[in-house]
Amino acid sequence: KKSNCIAVGGPYSNNLVGLAQILNEYQIKKKFLLIENNRIKMIGNYFLLKLLCKEEELMFINKESYLDAENFACNLDKNTFFIPEGAACVESIAGISTLVFDILKNEKDYQKNWSHWILDAGTGWTAAAVVWLNAYLQLEKKISIIMIAGDANSFQNSLFKVNEYFNLNGFYLSNHVYNFDLHFPTIGKSFGSMPQKIIQYIENFAKNNGILLDPIYSAKTFYTAEHLFGNEKENTLIIHSGGANALHGFVSNFFK
């Protein structure tokens, strides 16, 4: 049994903030490996990480070590559980799969039938689990995935690993016909890019809908969904990864 946790990510990672909260709650020892950033500022998620972590729990590593982070982590401590960037590991699949069952419960509770599910993808693991369960449970939902990061090959790799996980646990598809399509952002196509138009979109969306979006993931998801599927609002569900915390890191981009 591993006694502590080492995770890797960027200094502004949403994933690390959430992970730090859980590990602190359960009193699990941790160390976060952050890729070196010469322009880092005490804003956004990095500010939250500093609140949640002791100085010795945050360690900056160079790009070479970051690319081989698992071996680097194991050399630091053999008795550790390693969590890769974005928690893209098989141990996360059971948890992320609950998303589908939560949605189905909401459909039942609110007497809705969302026939078209739209969600973003970074590492693609959550989206892959949704696609797999849609096939396994024969939900017949149309799944549209907006690839904020990664590409078609990386998503297929995530889907392969998700299928492998379920097979190892005794769950098999009668056939491997997946009902999904991949799309890419129609604005700010490069990961991390923030055109002024998306900043204005976030401001308008907050005022008109009361929902806070971030410029990296959720805003591009909604913007792209509107442009691709604007006429399908009635039975469409957009599943996004939040972003209110991350917004604090982009204050200087707003209200110019």
Where are these regions (language model features)?
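Hydrophobic beta-strand scaffold residues
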Residues: 30, 56-58, 82, 143, ...
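Glycine-rich phosphate/pyrophosphate-binding loop at beta-loop-alpha junctions
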Residues: 93-181, 240-256
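Short beta-strand segments
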Residues: 33-35, 61, 83-86, 120-121, ...
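Short glycine/serine/threonine-rich phosphate/pyrophosphate-binding segments
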Residues: 12-19, 123-130, 219-222, 246-247
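A short, small-residue-rich loop immediately preceding and capping a beta-strand
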Residues: 1-22, 26-35, 113-123, 142, ...
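Active-site-proximal loop->helix
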Residues: 14-63, 153-165
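Active-site-adjacent helical/loop segments in soluble small-molecule enzymes
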Residues: 178, 183-234
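Small/polar-residue-rich loop-to-helix segments that shape phosphate-bearing ligand pockets
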Residues: 35-110, 179-201
